């Protein structure tokens, strides 16, 4: 069990040291494959961008990787790529440790209820549950109650549930899951458009491996794993 947010922050810092540039608060409003000459993107800066909102500007790339989760459905529909992705909603909560002796020392999986409980430094995180849902919405009270109940059953009194607002963090996240349960990793039928989508609940677990395999394919190298079962071509993409 690891802290995926901390990993992402450290990964961003490392990639920036290697020359990677990030464009936050920027909308990709159009994708235009140019056979033999790369991919043109139309970008729009939002009001939250440090430079303020602006009119559209263009950018050209040799190739692009679409890894935008459910947002990829709307991005690629104008190009005729109909992604077979569905939204699966998961919940988690985290709270500060009250009594270290009562808190978990390693990850625990409640297989009956599909809930994991893990120690992350001085906090305990409880996550689990999967249900079909929408991309937006408030956390489900029933789903959160199942997490609280599992925590109380396994580690009663281990965390501080009172205190100031925000001391207990409740979270709702949406995972993009392909209809056949397999991710979409590889080249699409459009030149220069590559996909890395639909990992579902395994996203955090396979993120690095999927990225490495895709980078190998884009670089003309044979990946260490066979991506045939994850090819977008199986879905006509």
Language model features with spans:
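C-terminal catalytic lobe of FAD-dependent flavoproteins
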Residues: 111-112, 155-237
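General beta-strand structural signal in soluble alpha/beta enzymes
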Residues: 23-24, 66, 195
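Short acidic, glycine-rich loop/turn motifs
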Residues: 43-55, 97-99
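Helical element adjacent to the flavin cofactor pocket in flavoenzyme catalytic cores
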Residues: 1-35, 39-49
């Amino acid at each position: 069990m690891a802290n995926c947010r901390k990993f992402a922050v450290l990964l961003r810092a490392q990639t920036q040291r290697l020359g990677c540039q990030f464009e936050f608060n920027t909308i990709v409003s159009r994708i235009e494959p140019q056979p033999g000459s790369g991919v043109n993107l139309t970008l729009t800066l939002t009001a939250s961008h440090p430079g303020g909102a602006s009119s559209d500007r263009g950018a050209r790339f040799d190739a692009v990787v679409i890894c935008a989760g459910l947002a990829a459905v709307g991005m690629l529909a104008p190009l005729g790529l109909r992604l077979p992705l569905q939204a699966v909603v998961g919940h988690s909560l985290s709270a500060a440790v009250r009594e270290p002796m009562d808190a978990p020392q390693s990850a625990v999986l409640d297989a009956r209820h599909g809930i994991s409980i893990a120690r992350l430094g001085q906090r305990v995180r409880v996550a689990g549950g999967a249900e079909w849902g929408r991309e937006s919405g408030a956390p489900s009270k029933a789903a959160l109650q199942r997490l609280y109940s599992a925590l109380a059953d396994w580690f009663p009194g281990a965390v501080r549930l009172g205190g100031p607002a925000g001391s207990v963090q409740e979270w709702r996240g949406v995972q993009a899951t392909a209809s056949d349960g397999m991710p979409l990793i590889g080249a699409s039928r459009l030149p220069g458009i590559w996909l890395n989508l639909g990992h579902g609940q395994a996203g955090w677990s396979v993120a690095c491996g999927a990225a490495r395999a895709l980078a190998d394919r884009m670089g003309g190298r044979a990946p260490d794993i066979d991506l045939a079962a994850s090819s977008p071509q199986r879905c006509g993409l």
